[in-house]
């Protein structure tokens, strides 16, 4: 579900510099996983997603603070909570993806055709990669290249005046 939602609203959702997709999209993935484990009915799952729409959060303004990684934990917690509540009869907007919800967290109209294509297409898990370093994926190429440069041209930290890296 996360891959499908991402297909509909990325890269604008992230690139507009406001949203932290781990928190805003991750909550739906957590609810889907929890719902599958809990054996939610389709109706309960739709209610869980409706609850998630009200709980999704994560802003790029928190990057560099303790609140940034907390968005991932909150997405997991909120997705699990939404699934548990829905399994106990709690309702949310069951037709949330038929509304303009996704348009509101994107700078353009969400591409629902892409969402459906990814939802019913190959599973996104086959595209997953392990992160080699404990930091944002866009910085990995810089780390790899710095390691290559240092291997070819050893320097001490005192010899390096400045490193400039612009991942975007």
Spell out what each predicted region is.
Residues 1-5, 108-111:
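Short glycine-enriched loops at secondary-structure junctions
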Residues 2-28:
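Aromatic-lined, polymer-binding surfaces characteristic
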Residues 21-23, 27, 32-168:
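Functionally critical mobile loop/hinge segments
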